[in-house]
């Protein structure tokens, strides 16, 4: 018997999405972003499915070491950089690139004794104001890194967009101009584009693109859907009905008696809840896919279960599958009902959810 709840990961969908992004940015190499356990899809699962990617972007050194231990040979980049001086020998030993965004990292590089230089991507704060050296700091920082024997040459250059997922917002153009003016005529690779940049801002594509959410079949833009770009959802979050009950008009259901039936109906109880990472704040009406149709959540999501209104004439039975999001029910749609973003839904699944290649 298949486990439930489970996240079924489609290798063909992942490969399709990589191909779509390559077509969108045909002159760029692809740094597939697989941080946060491959956006909840399983780090090694995703890396193995995307073995033709030119490199992988990660948030933590531990993630990079897991990929190397799993046999991944491609370029790896720590998108937040290293955190401690003791990380540096591991970067050297395992051939891992690092972002540099802060003076403290430069000091650690200058003071380290290493067997060979580290490949560095200098992050420029072109307007997001989160990580990166400011335009005023750039020349001095670049000179220090150039003079540092522990930094491989050439130094690569990157920035990150604040509003690329708002296609009508000109701020992305401002950031591109800032970055391009600062880095004009310098050697090394350049990378600006995240998923939204790759899909909506072709002039940002550069030497490398760094797609994340789009690889998993999800649009980065609110109100949009990955299918509009030829993307296919890579995750089907599936559980099953563990009870089907006749329910009388006027009867409440669930904690707090939050919802009361207005007419006789049949309710289904689905074996998934906030203990599995399904949001407790999912409101009444959030859709679940059961036997070829959308049915609404009613009552509060509890730790292990949620309830759906199957309708008075429903023929659904205990054991029938329920799709919380996936190919038939886009995660973007579910996120919009809940008032969050698809990124949060796919990355917050807990270890109780079995992640398996379909």
Swiss-Prot record:
Q: Which InterPro entries match?
A: Ala_racemase, Ala_racemase/Decarboxylase_C, Ala_racemase_C, Ala_racemase_N, Ala_racemase_pyridoxalP-BS, PLP-binding_barrel
- Residues annotated as the enzyme's active site: 35 (proton acceptor), 255 (proton acceptor)
SMART domains (UniProt xref): Ala_racemase_C
- Name its co-factor(s): pyridoxal 5'-phosphate
A single cellular component GO annotation? cytosol
Q: Read off the Pfam families from this record.
A: Ala_racemase_C, Ala_racemase_N
Listed pathway(s):
Amino-acid biosynthesis; D-alanine biosynthesis; D-alanine from L-alanine: step 1/1
Example of a GO biological process term: D-alanine biosynthetic process
Might you give the EC number(s) for this enzyme? 5.1.1.1
What GO MF annotations does this protein's record show? Answer: alanine racemase activity; pyridoxal phosphate binding
Its top-level enzyme class, in one word, is: isomerase
Q: Which family does it belong to?
A: Belongs to the alanine racemase family.
What function is annotated for this protein? Catalyzes the interconversion of L-alanine and D-alanine. May also act on other amino acids.
- Protein name per Swiss-Prot or TrEMBL: Alanine racemase
The gene behind this protein is alr
